[in-house]
Amino acid sequence: MKQIIQDLKKGDTILEEVPAPRVKYGSVLIQTTRTLVSLGTERMLVDFGKANFIQKAKQQPDKVKMVLDKVKTDGLRPTLEAVFNKLGQPLPLGYCNVGKVVEVGKGVTEYSVGDRVASNGHHAEYVCVPKNLVAKIPDNVTDEEAAFTVIGSIGLQGIRLLQPTFGETIVVVGLGLIGLVTAELLLANGCNVIGFDFDPNKVKIAKEKGIIAINPSEGTNQVKFVESYTNNIGADGVIITASNKSNEIISQSANMCRKRGRIILVGVIGLDISRADFFEKEITFQVSCSYGAGRYDEEYEQK
């Protein structure tokens, strides 16, 4: 079968011919009909692969510390061999998959052959996915629409953590795919939604969906706009779906909030937080983990 993989050592993105997976206990084998490319996450992986070793190290300083610790315990040569072996392993891309179940593993009673399902499977003709990371697709939902399921669940988890109530004013910073979906979900929840993005095309799409969308590069001060909109009270909450290394985003988000406002980070930004920005308003800050409870928990995902 064909599968898209990323070579982290050379930086190449390859359509590779690989063996089809076999169904495992507690999993289902899915024949793919659609996959969705997540530009932010997958572009980040591609850019990481294209970077040289020094650039890779700068992008992942926490991993550098792990390597240095390993050098101290195992020595330089074994450590370098381990690093090169790790980078040499092909990385499957993609996590928004739609298809039909073609085989059901032992221990699975929730799904049957022929079911249309959405999952976090890769860009591949066939994927084997644990049952808890699979969901049936309603008959009135197309495959193209269902391909956005995982993207939507990432935004939805940020909203769960924020716990917005009807009529609250929520700011979404970053109107990429996840940001737009998050903003729409907030609108459906009865919130007043303000969105910020520097891309005029994304701002245009957001406005068409009923979001109060602003492009700061056109001269609008984000903090002052929120203050004006809320009669100098501030936003009840901010969800950050942007991807940017700057620390300015977290500072601006705090300044947009009212006293005891909430900030949820869904994206990836600089986090050199100023105590003063959070102290006087007693602002709550939390990082959202992927698409919710159970993610990265082996007991939930694999058993």
Predicted feature descriptions by range:
Residues 1-85, 89, 121:
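Short N-terminal strand-loop motif that marks the start
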Residues 34, 115-116, 126, 169, ...:
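Residue-level marker of beta-strand positions
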Residues 92-95, 120-132:
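A structural motif shared across PLP-dependent enzymes of the aminotransferase-like
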Residues 116, 145-219:
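Mid-domain Rossmann-like dinucleotide-binding core that forms the NAD(H)/NADP(H) cofactor-binding site
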Residues 204, 209-288, 294:
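Glycine-rich cofactor phosphate-binding loops and adjacent beta1-alpha1 units
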